[in-house]
C-alpha cells in the first residue's frame, strides 16, 4: 500500500495529552501517527482559557524542560501573565497565563505540522486491534487499519461522553464534538477496570453586554513573565486585564430554588466531579454559610468578544443559568453565547498502569490524560509527554523512564495515580509533593533537561541554552565561594545597606548572600566582589535560591536518600501477599490488587501501615537468605510464629 499504514507509535486524540505524546515520540525518533477526529481542534482548550497555576505551572515548566510544547505555545498565545504567590517562598511560586484560544491552538498545530517523524490524520478511532496480550494497532470509523506495536490513548472526555444541561442530556465528547462510543465499547470488551467521572464548564458571555465599570480590574504582572525557559517577553501578543465580580444572596437563592432541576442533585449524573473546581451549585450547597463567591471574567482572545466567567461552572437548565448570570453585579444585561454544561465520561483505573503509563493488561497500550482520572490541561500534557516518550523507548528496545517523587511533580503525579488511584478527578497541588523545596518552577530545567537530552527529547537549541545557563551558575557560585569580603575594605555604611549590618569578620561572598534581604546585584557592588558579575536573571535567581535555602535543601536531600532505599527495594511482580503471614487480610488484599513495584510504592497505598512495610522487609531479607543458601523460597513465609519479629508483627 502506497499510503503509510505501519507506524512505530500511534497516538489517539489531539488534545493536550495527545499532542505532547505525539511530539515526544517523534522527537525520540519513532515513526508516529497522530489520529484525531478533527484536525481543526488540535490543541484546543476545551474549558478555561488559561495555562498554569499552583502545582500546574510546575508541571508546565517540567514539560518545557523535557522539550514539550505547552510553555512555548503559551508564550506565543498568552494575553495575560501573572506569578502567583510572588510574595511567598520560591517553592510555591507559580506562573499562570490567560491564553488566546486561537493563537494557542495555532502554535501547537505549527509544531505538530513541522515535527519530523510525525504524521497527522483526521479520523476517529473505533477499535483497538490486539493479539493475545499485545496491542497491534487501531481501526478508524471508516475501516482504515493502522498497525503499530505501541498505541497511546488520550481520549479526554470523549469515551461515552454524555453532556447534561438541566435534566436534558445528549451524547458528545464536548460541546460540538461527537463522543467515542465504539472505542468506549471496545475498551469495555477488553475488561480494563473503569468508572465514570464528570466535569463541567460555565456559560460563555458576550463582553459587549457586560458592565466592567462596576468590577475590579485584575491586570497582569509588569514586567511580564515568560513560561518557557527559552521564552522571551517579546513573543507575547497584546496583554489584556481580567475582571472580578461576585455572586450574592440573590444568586444563591436562585440556585437553591432550582437544585431539583440540577442533574447532580436529582441523581441523573452518576460520575464524581472535581473537588477543587466545583460547580456553582456545588459551592452553594457545600459552603452554605458563604454569602458570596468570586467570579473572574477572563477574555477568550484578542479577536473575540467571548468572556469565560471562571467560578460559575454549572449544569443547571438554561433559563436558570440566565437568571443566575443576570443576578450578578455587572452582568445584569449579559448575553450568553454558549450554555454551561456538565459532561460525564469513562475513565480507567490508573492503578492498572505501570509507571511508564503502559497498561498492565496489554503490552504496548499506554493511557494519558483524563482517561487516567486526572483533570486539567497541564496534568494531561505531562502524562502525554511521558506516555509518548515511553512508547517510543519501548519500540526502540530501550528502558522505560519515569521521574521519582523527589525529581519532579510529574513523578508525584504518576506515583499518586498508580499507587492510590482516584475517586474524583485528580488535580496537582504543590502540597502533594513531599520535597517541594527542591521541586520548584525555576529549577525544572536543572532537574530534568539532562535526562531529556539522554532520552532524545531535547533538541540542540535547548541543550545549548541549558548548558550555557548551568555552566554560568556553577562558575558564578564558585567565584562567590572563593571571594572574601574584608571588614577593613567594606565601609560600614555599605555593609549596612547591602547585608544589614557592618562586617565584624571576613565572610565569603556566598555566605553573605545567604542573609534574608541580601540581593546578588547589591552584593556585587561591595569592594572585593568578583568583577564582571552575572547578568542573566535566571542564573542570578538560581544562585540566590541556592545560597538562601541551602540548609533546608540539604536536610531535604537527607530525607530523599532514606526514601530512595525503599524506592530501590523491588517487590516480586508475582508475589502472592496472602502467603506473607502476619499481614492483615485488608493489607494482603490491597497489595494483591495494586501489585506495587517497590517497597516505597507499597507504603503509599492507602491502608498499608508502616508496620506492614517492616514485615515485608523482614520477608525480603529471609527470602534473600534462603536464596543465598540455595533453598527453595517459593513457599517461604515472612513469619512462622517464631522469633521476636513474628510476635511484634502479628496482626499487621
From Swiss-Prot:
InterPro entries assigned: FAD/NAD-bd_sf, GIDA_C_N, MnmG, MnmG-rel, MnmG-rel_CS, MnmG_C, MnmG_C_subdom, MnmG_C_subdom_sf
Stretches for region Disordered: 631-652
Residues at which FAD binds: 13-18
Matches recorded under SMART domains: GIDA_assoc_3 (SM01228)
Disulphide bond pairs: none
GO biological process: tRNA methylation; tRNA wobble uridine modification
UniProt keyword annotation of Manganese present: no
Protein's UniProt keywords contain Metal-binding: no
Reported cofactor(s): FAD
Superkingdom in the source lineage: Bacteria
Low complexity composition bias: residue spans: 631-640
One GO CC term, this protein: cytosol
TM region(s), chain numbering: none
UniProt-listed Gene3D superfamilies: FAD/NAD(P)-binding domain, GidA associated domain, C-terminal subdomain, tRNA uridine 5-carboxymethylaminomethyl modification enzyme MnmG/GidA
Binding locations of NAD(+): 273-287
Assembly mode: Homodimer. Heterotetramer of two MnmE and two MnmG subunits.
Function as written in the Swiss-Prot or TrEMBL entry: NAD-binding protein involved in the addition of a carboxymethylaminomethyl (cmnm) group at the wobble position (U34) of certain tRNAs, forming tRNA-cmnm(5)s(2)U34.
Classification via PANTHER family: GLUCOSE INHIBITED DIVISION PROTEIN A, PROTEIN MTO1 HOMOLOG, MITOCHONDRIAL
Family (UniProt): Belongs to the MnmG family.
Name under which the protein is recorded: tRNA uridine 5-carboxymethylaminomethyl modification enzyme MnmG
Organism: Aromatoleum aromaticum (strain DSM 19018 / LMG 30748 / EbN1) (Azoarcus sp. (strain EbN1))
UniProt gene name: mnmG
Amino acid at each position: 500500500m502506497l499510503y503509510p499504514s505501519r507506524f512505530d507509535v500511534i497516538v489517539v486524540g489531539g488534545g493536550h495529552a495527545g499532542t505532547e505524546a505525539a511530539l515526544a515520540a517523534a522527537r525520540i525518533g519513532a515513526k508516529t501517527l497522530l489520529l484525531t477526529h478533527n484536525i481543526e481542534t488540535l490543541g484546543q482548550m476545551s474549558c478555561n482559557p488559561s495555562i498554569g497555576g499552583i502545582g500546574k505551572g510546575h508541571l508546565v515548566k517540567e514539560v518545557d524542560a523535557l522539550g514539550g510544547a505547552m510553555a512555548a505555545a503559551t508564550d506565543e498565545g498568552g494575553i495575560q501573565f501573572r506569578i502567583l504567590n510572588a510574595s511567598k517562598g520560591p517553592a510555591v511560586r507559580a506562573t499562570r497565563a490567560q491564553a488566546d484560544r486561537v493563537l494557542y491552538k495555532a502554535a501547537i498545530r505549527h509544531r505538530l505540522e513541522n515535527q519530523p517523524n510525525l504524521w497527522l490524520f483526521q479520523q476517529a478511532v473505533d477499535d483497538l486491534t490486539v493479539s493475545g496480550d499485545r496491542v497491534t494497532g487501531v481501526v478508524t470509523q471508516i475501516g482504515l487499519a493502522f498497525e503499530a506495536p505501541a498505541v497511546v490513548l488520550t481520549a479526554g472526555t470523549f469515551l461515552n461522553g454524555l453532556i447534561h444541561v438541566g435534566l436534558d442530556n445528549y451524547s458528545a465528547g464536548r460541546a460540538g464534538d461527537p463522543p467515542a462510543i465504539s472505542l468506549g465499547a471496545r475498551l469495555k470488551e477488553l475488561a480494563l477496570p473503569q468508572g465514570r467521572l464528570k466535569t463541567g464548564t460555565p456559560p460563555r458571555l458576550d463582553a459587549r453586554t457586560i458592565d466592567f465599570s462596576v468590577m475590579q480590574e485584575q491586570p497582569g504582572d509588569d514586567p511580564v513573565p515568560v513560561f518557557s525557559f527559552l521564552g522571551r517577553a517579546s513573543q507575547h501578543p497584546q496583554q489584556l486585564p481580567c475582571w472580578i465580580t461576585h455572586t450574592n444572596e440573590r444568586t444563591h437563592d436562585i440556585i437553591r430554588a432550582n437544585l431539583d432541576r440540577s442533574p447532580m442533585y436529582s441523581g441523573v449524573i452518576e460520575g464524581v466531579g472535581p473537588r477543587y473546581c466545583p460547580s456553582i451549585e456545588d459551592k452553594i450547597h457545600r459552603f452554605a454559610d458563604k454569602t458570596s463567591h468570586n467570579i473572574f471574567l477572563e477574555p477568550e482572545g484578542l479577536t473575540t468578544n467571548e468572556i469565560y466567567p471562571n467560578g460559575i461552572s454549572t449544569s443547571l437548565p438554561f433559563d436558570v443559568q440566565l437568571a443566575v448570570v443576570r443576578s450578578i453585579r455587572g452582568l445584569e444585561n449579559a448575553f450568553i453565547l454558549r450554555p454551561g454544561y456538565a459532561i460525564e465520561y469513562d475513565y480507567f483505573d490508573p492503578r492498572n498502569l505501570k509507571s511508564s503509563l503502559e497498561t498492565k493488561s496489554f503490552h504496548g497500550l499506554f493511557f494519558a490524560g483524563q482517561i487516567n482520572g486526572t483533570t486539567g490541561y497541564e496534568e494531561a500534557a505531562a502524562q502525554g509527554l511521558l506516555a509518548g516518550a515511553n512508547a517510543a523507548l519501548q519500540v526502540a528496545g530501550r528502558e522505560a523512564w519515569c521521574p521519582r517523587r523527589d525529581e519532579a511533580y510529574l513523578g508525584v503525579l504518576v506515583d499518586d495515580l498508580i499507587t492510590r488511584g482516584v475517586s474524583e478527578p485528580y488535580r496537582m497541588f504543590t502540597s502533594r509533593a513531599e520535597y517541594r523545596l527542591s521541586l520548584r518552577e525555576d529549577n525544572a530545567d536543572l532537574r530534568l533537561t539532562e535526562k531529556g537530552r539522554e532520552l532524545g527529547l531535547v533538541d540542540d537549541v535547548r541543550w545549548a541554552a541549558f548548558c550555557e545557563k548551568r555552566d554560568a551558575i556553577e562558575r558564578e557560585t564558585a567565584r562567590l565561594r572563593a571571594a572574601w569580603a574584608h571588614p577593613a575594605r567594606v565601609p560600614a555604611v555599605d555593609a549596612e545597606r547591602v547585608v544589614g549590618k557592618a562586617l565584624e569578620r571576613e565572610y565569603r561572598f556566598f555566605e553573605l548572600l545567604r542573609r534574608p534581604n541580601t540581593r546578588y546585584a547589591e552584593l556585587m557592588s561591595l569592594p572585593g566582589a568578583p568583577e564582571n558579575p552575572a547578568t542573566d536573571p535566571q542564573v542570578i535567581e538560581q544562585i540566590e535560591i541556592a545560597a538562601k535555602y541551602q540548609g533546608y535543601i540539604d536536610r531535604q536531600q537527607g530525607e530523599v536518600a532514606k526514601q530512595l532505599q525503599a524506592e530501590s527495594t523491588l517487590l516480586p511482580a508475582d508475589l502472592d501477599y496472602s502467603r506473607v503471614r502476619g499481614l492483615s487480610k485488608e493489607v494482603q488484599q490491597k497489595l494483591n490488587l495494586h501489585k506495587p513495584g517497590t517497597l516505597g510504592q507499597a507504603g503509599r497505598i492507602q491502608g498499608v501501615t508502616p508496620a506492614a512495610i517492616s514485615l515485608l522487609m523482614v520477608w525480603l531479607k529471609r527470602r534473600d537468605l534462603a536464596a543465598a543458601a540455595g533453598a527453595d523460597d517459593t513457599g517461604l513465609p515472612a513469619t512462622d510464629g517464631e522469633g521476636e519479629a513474628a510476635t511484634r508483627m502479628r496482626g499487621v
